[in-house]
Amino acid sequence: RDCGKMCEEETWKG
């Protein structure tokens, strides 16, 4: 899935 700018941070967990 596309995370966008969240991909840059480790906050993205999907």
Swiss-Prot record:
Post-translational modification: Amidation at Gly-14 does not impact activity, since a non-amidated synthetic peptide shows the same absence of activity than the natural amidated peptide.
Record function comment: Probable toxin.
Top-level taxon of the source organism: Eukaryota
Modified residues (Glycine amide): 14
Protein transport as UniProt keyword: no
Domain notes: The cysteine framework is C-C.
Keyword annotations of the record: Amidation, Disulfide bond, Secreted, Toxin
Entry GO terms, CC: extracellular region
Record's keyword annotation contains Ubl conjugation: no
Name the record gives this protein: Conotoxin Cca1669
Subcellular location: Secreted
Disulfide pattern: 3-7
Note: Negative results: does not modulate oxytocin (OXTR), vasopressin (AVPR1A and AVPR1B), NMDA (GRIN1 and GRIN2A), muscarinic (CHRM1 and CHRM3), and nicotinic acetylcholine receptors (alpha-7, and alpha-3-beta-4), and voltage-gated calcium (Cav) and sodium channels (Nav).
Tissue specificity comment: Expressed by the venom duct.
GO MF term list: toxin activity
